[in-house]
Amino acid sequence: MGAFLTFQKDSDQIYPGWKEKLGYTGESSVQAASFDWQKKAAAAAFVGAQARTGRSTVVRRALDQSSRYADLSLTEEDLVKNGKHVLVAYIMNQGGYDYLATAAHVAAESSTGTNVNVCTTDDFTKTVDALVYYIDPENEEMKIAYPVPLFDRNITDGRAMMCSVLTLSIGNNQGMGDVEYGKIYDIYFPPSYLRFFDGPACSILDMWRILGRDMTDGGLVVGTIIKPKLGLQPKPFGEACYAFGQGGDFIKNDEPQGNQVFCQMNECIPEVVTAMKACIKETGSEKLFSANITADDPAEMIARGKYILGQFGPMAENCAFLVDGYVAGGTAVTVARRNFPKQFFHYHRAGHGAVTSPQTQRGYTAFVHTKISRVIGASGIHVGTMSFGKMVGDASDKGIAYMLQQDAAGGPYYHQKWEGVVQTTPIISGGMNALRLPAFFENLGHSNVILTAGGGTFGHKDGPKQGATSCRQDEEAWKLWKAGTYGDVSLSDGVIEYAKTHEEIKGAFLTFQKDSDQIYPGWKEKLGYTGESSVQAASFDWQKKAA
């Protein structure tokens, strides 16, 4: 009977007529009012709100905890200045409930609260409440400040853990009935808290050093993804590495490649090492390889990493480690970062679209996911192609690259100061080829990124060596156009002018003719080409392996 008297709102809704049936004649009391826990934790009230026009007209009820979990007098400027809170900006629709009440419910569920007041709450507990400090119902925006002490720390070294940040900020609040949808669009980490995360150990500077590049503006690292992504056995896989390595810098496993029964690591990696040694000897240039060590079991990841480094031997610094960071999770990321701090940590985001896609109204955005990758230690992460390739994206996604590479950068809502945290290198992939690169560089403003072009190099009509070379040449073409070498002409005309004396780029025009027609109108006449459109890569004899 005590439960009926304590949770009377539930009693009324679930057990109509309970008062008469139990012989209770008292008035409805405030929830838990008869329980005196040193007079702590005053009870919350329930409020109802009419659903929005066009939605259900049923009046729904939400727990209003705004008196405790909201403080709209707080200013973002002061919160940032004090440096004691992680700030999170959400897009959350009104969903038929009072907006502030729902936002406060999110803050409560994401910190110290629950759906009822509990007797164990004390004065200290309230000091670590998450607080709603800003709402804009019309634009469906809310911001919550999370006190740093809320977040879990390692018992081994006191370091911070991203899984704790995500558990609170994007955990149970994603499944609450009064939150129709909510998505994180930006997150701010105070510098004092950032210092407790690992951050990257290596960056593109390490690649430039190995490749003998300028350490300030070393430019594009021309890379590829071995294609087909699955189906090659060890020897053909090694031959593909050799073919690309004749013209390119960097070769990576595709994200599903690892230790398939038809291409086991103990047979494939030796073939890769042999191919790389041959390419280095023949070209006089260093080569890099990114090996996939992703696994469910941390012990398996470590075993893979140790085996690969043993095979590379004196060339160990030429080897990066790839981890499918989204699907394998933060534990796998930290295993790689902490056990192999001397290796370039290649973060692949396969699967991220399940929560980051613009079509998804829950989770977080690609910007947030990418920013988190720098915090937890990625040396490089795939960022799509900013609408210049086949992946979903927009030219404005260059803000993602700025957040990864700069020491201070603005996001959709917050300006983040990194205070010396090593940069994370944008890795671009997905439908890219030489012809698409100049406009990409112009939009980004520089070419200090890693390219991993699979079809864009292995699809070149003359082979992967020429495909890789064409990408390097188009970076040079963009730089020359930028410097005014070709006079006052458009970027497309500048690239065409460069192509007149560079056969590899000219071959890209002939290979990717749909791109040629769309990006470089009039290219055939300007290059003096009179032939018909040919089937992509038809003239490349794969059996010769592009020696």
From Swiss-Prot:
Keywords: Calvin cycle, Carbon dioxide fixation, Chloroplast, Lyase, Magnesium, Metal-binding, Monooxygenase, Oxidoreductase, Photorespiration, Photosynthesis, Plastid, Transit peptide. Substrate binds at residues 172, 229, 349, 382, 429. GO terms for biological process: reductive pentose-phosphate cycle. Gene3D superfamilies: Ribulose bisphosphate carboxylase, large subunit, C-terminal domain, RuBisCO large subunit, N-terminal domain. It is found in: Plastid, Chloroplast. The modification N6-carboxylysine is found at residue 252. Transmembrane segments: none annotated. Its EC number is 4.1.1.39. It is an enzyme of class 4 (lyase). Homodimer. This is Ribulose 1,5-bisphosphate carboxylase, chloroplastic. The lineage of its organism: Eukaryota, Sar, Alveolata, Dinophyceae, Gonyaulacales.
